[in-house]
Amino acid sequence: MLGMKPLGFIGNGLTSALVDNGSIVWLTFPRFDSPSVFGKLLDDNAGEFSIRPVEDKFKVSQSYLVPNVLSTTFKSSNGKAEIVDLMPIGEKAIIRKVRTEIPLSFKIIPMFNYGLYRPIIRRKDDGIQFLNPVSRECLSLLSDVPTDEIKPPGTTLYLVYSSDCAYGPLDKGKQLENDLENSFNLTIDYWKDKIRSNDEVWRTSVGVLLGLIYSPSGSSIAAATTSLPEAVGDSRNWDYRFVWVRDSSMISEALLYSGYVVEARRILNFMLALVNFTAKPLLHPLYAVDGSDPPPEIEIPWLSGYMNSRPVRVGNAAASQIQLDIEGFLVDAIYKYYKYTSDRVFVEENWDKIKYIGDWVSKNWMLKDAGMWEDRGDPKHYTHSKVMMWVALDRIEKIMNVKIHEKDEIKEWVMRNCVKDGSFVRSSDSNDVDANLLTLPLYDFIDVKDPIFLKTLKRIEDELYVDGFVKRYSQDFMGEAKHPFALATIWLARVYIRLGRKERAMELLDKVLKPSGTLYLIGEHIDVENMEYTGNYPQAFVHAQLLLALKEVKGLST
């Protein structure tokens, strides 16, 4: 099984893959939340597509030519080789262009349904078909390599998914080869034109956010993977291949301020389309990429898990929770979009939905919920959730130029029930602090220099700060929180920026990036001892907050 090291990420708005030094170890077809066809990331026997030198001694490195176009380079005493991996725009496919001076071995072992089914293999003159034995779907590999060895000067491998094996590409002959070369070059041009910057960190973060957008609907998933553990060997393994309202709101904001107004608006449109008038405006905290209800959470018993971290889960039971902060995140993102673009038509088209959110929050703000961290224990009056309900009403006041009295009631309740010994606490029945309290000044609930917040900040620094990183909390319903959280650490950096401590903020951002190596892809948690990421990867809302922090550290407002 793989060690905890940075993996290359590529995506194309339909699905995504992770590449480990020439081996595709995670790939789902036909979309992000589909079962894997290459799943070595979660089990050695769950399928992979690997290319590596025949000889044993070589050096390997990975880098991005442009975002979502990954180069893997092998160097040995006998020469060098390069694999360029990308997912062509608009296709459920992957192209691997190989240029080499040395012999390379390649191995392709797809396994359908998370490693459960071995394919039926059909060899044809111009490639191989891999058929799912329990359905009509198949993978087709177009290749002019007749064996499992790639000889100099190299070749181009094209792997494409078909929902029905009757419509595979193996009968298109030479015409497809010309189209394939064109698709490869145009995909590179697409990302080069789409993301223009000399800042590699910024460029990679934008590439991750755009690569994780499901282009048919405009929705944005939280991460490319499922069940990468928060701590190796632990059971905190969740499926993040869904559209969280909270995460998507952050992503919309980050894309907006990075110049991607259309993509930001599409994310907002996707979420607004889910608002209903019958009950809670957003019934679920998360949705499938097409807007349907997320599937039930189940465990996959035949997979050993990442480094034997069981169970492997697909689906996410948090979908059934009540989370009261999400409407606040959405309305805040809508307000920022409106303020940035002056797009009054957008607001007017969604006026009834925005107003309903305000009405519902005004009537239901005293409910308990599972909180931002999706605690699976008893619901509580979480401070952060109450604050985000205040945010919802505050932003609606600004958008609609009205006064909502319940906003003041929420703030009074929070200050009366969620402040203890001069500090904000995690919930009304707790004396502990929580890293999400760092967001209170970020969302203008309280001034960053207010004595109550400064005491809260001091407690977070004393109680949750670990070797330059910030834990979310000390413990939850599953016990102790083992590793710091990348998102919380960036929040702390954003607070320091507001306090004028920019050098300290930059130190924190540099530390968050340190485990990413040269790829600048960031995970969810940081294993401080090994200086490696844990949890699902790459993590979209971390990259979103990083983009906001980088903008703020340069003195630009968000």
From Swiss-Prot:
- Gene3D superfamilies tied to this protein: 1.50.10.10
Keyword entries, A-Z: Carbohydrate metabolism, Glycosidase, Hydrolase
Describe activity versus temperature: Optimum temperature is 60 degrees Celsius.
Membrane spanning stretches = none
GO MF, one annotated term: alpha,alpha-trehalase activity
Q: Which residues form a coiled coil?
A: none
The pathway that the record names for this protein is: Glycan degradation; trehalose degradation; D-glucose from alpha,alpha-trehalose: step 1/1
The record's pH note reads: Optimum pH is 4.0. More than half of the maximal activity is observed over a range between pH 3.3 and 4.0.
Q: What EC number is given for this enzyme?
A: 3.2.1.28
Q: Which domain of life is it from?
A: Archaea
The listed outcome for E524Q is: Less than 1% of wild-type activity
Which reactions is this enzyme annotated as catalysing?
Answer: alpha,alpha-trehalose + H2O = alpha-D-glucose + beta-D-glucose
Query: What does the UniProt record say this protein does?
Result: Catalyzes the hydrolysis of alpha,alpha-trehalose into two molecules of D-glucose.
Protein family according to the UniProt entry? Belongs to the glycosyl hydrolase 15 family.
Q: What is this protein called?
A: Trehalase 1
Lineage of producing organism: Archaea, Thermoproteota, Thermoprotei, Sulfolobales, Sulfolobaceae
